[in-house]
Structure formats: C-alpha cells, structure tokens
Amino acid sequence: MLKVLHTGDWHIGSFPGPEVGGQNSRFQDICRCLDFQAMYAEEHRPNLIVVSGDIFHQARVWSDRGLRESRTAIDHIRRLSNVAPTVVLRGTPNHDSEEQFEMLVTAFYGDDSVSVVT
C-alpha cells in the first residue's frame, strides 16, 4: 500500500504576538508544529511526502528574517526528505515568492530525494 504524507500551509514567519527570550513565540510555535510533523513522518514512514505550498507566511520580508525563515524551511524539508522522497509545490505568490523558491531549488540542487516545483 502506498502511503503519502500530504502537508502544506506551514506559513513559516513571524506573527504579531509575545516575545519570549527575544524570540517571537508564534514563530517558535510553528517550529514546534513542524518538528511534530517530522516526528510523525519518521514514525509512520510514508512512501512519498507532498508539501503543497504556502510554506512561507509572507513573500517579502527583510533579509535577516527572510534568511531565518528560508533556513527553517530548508532544514524541515531536508528532515522530511530523509524519510521519503519529497515534492515541494510553490503556493500562492503572496506567500511563496519566486525568490524564496529559487533559494529552495538551489538548496536542493542535486538532491534526488527532493523535487521543488515552481
């Protein structure tokens, strides 16, 4: 039986909310949810993982925040791809910018376990 883990609408980003220890607590909540998702994948071992867009909350952000959000996405996609081949689809332009997805394409260039579709 083919098992597919389908996920999307991660909306990685900083949202208005409290800061704890200088960190946006909403961003930390998103990271904890992504960590749970990866643990679920590691436990249930799907044959294929599909990430269907809206990975990022905002398409246009300042460089330091944008780099942190892109690094979070890359690290999480890499963790998922260690479980099963992973297909990443670009979402709506107001969330997933062309530049963000070019960074994902570059990050996973030559990695046969990840396909980024723009």
Segments predicted by a language model, with ranges:
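A secondary-structure boundary/capping signal
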Residues: 6-8, 52
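Extreme N-terminal starter segment of soluble prokaryotic enzymes
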Residues: 1-5
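Short polar catalytic/cofactor-binding loops
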Residues: 8-14
